[in-house]
Amino acid sequence: PHPLDEVNLDYRVTGGARAGSDDEVMITACRKEIVEDYTAVMELAGLRAVIVDVGLFAMERGYEFVAATLGESLEGRAIALMDFGDVSTRLDLFVDGAVIYGRDQNFGGRILTENIRSRYGIDYREAEALKRTGDLPQNYEADLLAPFREAMAREAARGMEFCLSARHGVEHVDALLICGGCAQIPDMAPLIESHVGVPTLIADPFAPGSGIRASKLVARYAPLMIKAAGLAVRGAT
């Protein structure tokens, strides 16, 4: 939908040529202004961007570290990864390490932050900080957190329903991994599991078996670090 001079293009050969067939090539396109926005932010921080990667590709590489921590062969098994972000939630379905289905949902942790801001009459930055520390009035858990947890579990179930109704050849999901900031809400995994009926775990790219050694500070935020882990090995794999 955009002129070629307004986009950045790159490609990758994803499959070798079989007898009598052509190579499989993946082409990625992104508007130049989006790439320029990212590089400008890095320049403000005194950094120079060598590579601007695609989030999905970074998640695919990061998923490999998480898969290595599960302690069993995942060959032929369907594993869903649900990333609860600030403004949206992304569900990707992996089979043999490759994404065969993906969908974004309009749900994220900002909903809870806005509810905190509105209920207690504070600004957004303070609401976000208090959400992370949990230093809120006693009625917070019953009035705000519990309803959000239920809404989050319903969104997970909704995402799984869409996933299973898509025509991608997979009839059931073997496990659901959750990540992102909201995945750190206490007892979130078992609540989601009760809604989706699929074994649900918190994704941790630093757990034993991943091959990554992280500092205690970084490990505290493990469910938020899958994409970062994938970015870190860009070009190294």
Please give the residue ranges for each predicted region.
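Glycine-rich phosphate-binding/hydrolytic loop that grips phosphoryl groups
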Residues: 58-61, 183, 201-237
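Active-site neighborhood for divalent-cation/phosphate handling
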Residues: 1-67, 175, 205-211, 224
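Phosphate-interacting basic helix/loop segments used at nucleotide- and nucleic-acid interfaces
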Residues: 66-77, 157-164
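Glycine-rich phosphate-binding loops at beta-strand->alpha-helix junctions
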Residues: 148, 171-201, 206
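Adenine-nucleotide phosphate-binding core of ATP-dependent small-molecule kinases
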Residues: 114, 118-119, 127-174, 182
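Gly/Thr-rich phosphate-binding beta-strand-loop-beta motif of the actin/hexokinase/Hsp70
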Residues: 21, 69-101, 108-111, 116-119
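Glycine-rich phosphate-binding loop plus the immediately following alpha-helix
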Residues: 35-61, 98-138
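Conserved beta-strand elements of the Class I
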Residues: 26, 78-82, 177
